[in-house]
Regions:
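HotDog/MaoC-like acyl-thioester-processing domains
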Residues: 2-7, 88-176, 281-283
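Compositionally biased, intrinsically disordered low-complexity regions
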Residues: 17-18, 106, 117, 125, ...
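Hot-dog-fold acyl-thioester-processing enzymes
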Residues: 1-81, 143-270
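Short, low-complexity cationic-aromatic patches
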Residues: 54-55, 87-92, 244, 276-282
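A cross-kingdom feature marking solvent-exposed beta-strand/loop segments within repeated
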Residues: 77-88, 103-104, 266-273, 277
């Protein structure tokens, strides 16, 4: 709960997660991503990768979900991702572990039953290589309204080196031999500052979001425990199961991929990402 957090606390999250083929396929297919790096092993190897590359949205979801039990299981809402950077590529069979530092705690001046916790998290693979680093802000309930909870912020945030693991260009590789597998108009020279794309695809979110969230080991009860919500429906947004925010975030990446990311060797950074409204089963992104 909010009163349990202090700036400077460090959590080495338990469990870890080995990315198996089932999880890879479930999330890659659900997201509607079209980048051949996530679909075609021969294409990925031609471009210098070891095999199929996990989409950035999947890497994000695996690592964020590992932090939930310690950080946001008692959250009202996940508010914002900040400076989300991607590092070493992630493959099927890689094991990811996560660590989080509490950067700041800010009790609400309007609602005494809640406040915002600001964290910095990092995900590493089995070789200790950083695969993702990000900050996020979470609105969290208080358990005891009378419990002391002071506003505080670290003077210096954790400095995490996160370098994209993009294979070097190799003149000896025949990249053009498989260029037909990606959309033609999504190369670097096709984009201009100020271009606006209205993406033509969408995806209905059904009750399958519960199973997808479970596959990630995300333990937040607002995504899976309707009985809990029914005990006090006014406390919870919409009074029903809310879709884990990483799912619509992942859909936004996938739906935009054929217009923006088909020829991307890697996503580098998301400077910010906000959850400005809830998604429920039956909504279309």
């Amino acid at each position: 709960y909010l009163e349990d957090f202090r700036p400077g606390q460090v959590f080495r999250h338990k469990g870890g997660k080995t990315l198996n083929e089932g999880l890879f396929n479930a999330f890659t297919d659900f997201s509607m991503t079209t980048n051949p790096l996530h679909k075609n092993a021969e294409y990925a190897r031609l471009h210098g990768f070891k095999g199929l590359v996990a989409p950035p949205g999947l890497v994000m979801n695996v690592v964020v979900s590992q932090t939930v039990e310690d950080i946001s299981e008692n959250a009202r809402a996940n508010l914002e991702y900040i400076n989300m950077r991607f590092g070493a590529p992630v493959y099927i069979g890689d094991t990811l572990e996560a660590e989080t530092t509490i950067v700041g705690v800010a009790p609400s001046t309007k609602d005494p039953d809640r406040g915002v916790v600001h964290v910095s998290s990092v995900g590493r693979n089995q070789r200790g290589e950083v695969v993702i680093a990000f900050e996020r802000k979470v609105q969290i309930w208080k358990n005891d309204l009378a419990a002391p909870c002071e506003k505080g912020e670290l003077e210096k945030k954790p400095q995490i080196e996160c370098t994209p693991g993009i294979p070097a260009y190799d003149r000896g590789r025949d990249y053009k031999s498989k260029s037909h597998l990606a959309n033609r108009d999504t190369f670097f020279e096709d984009f201009n500052a100020g271009d606006v794309y209205e993406h033509s695809r969408g995806r209905l979110v059904t009750e399958e979001h519960i199973a997808l969230t479970g596959q990630l080991d995300n333990t937040s009860q607002v995504h899976c425990n309707q009985f809990l919500i029914d005990q006090n429906p006014e406390k919870y947004i919409g009074g029903r199961l809310i879709v884990y925010g990483g799912i619509p975030f992942n859909l936004c990446l996938g739906i935009s991929c054929p217009d923006i990311g088909d020829n991307s060797p890697a996503d580098i950074v998301y400077t910010t990402g906000r959850h400005v409204g809830p998604i429920f089963a039956g909504d279309t992104v």
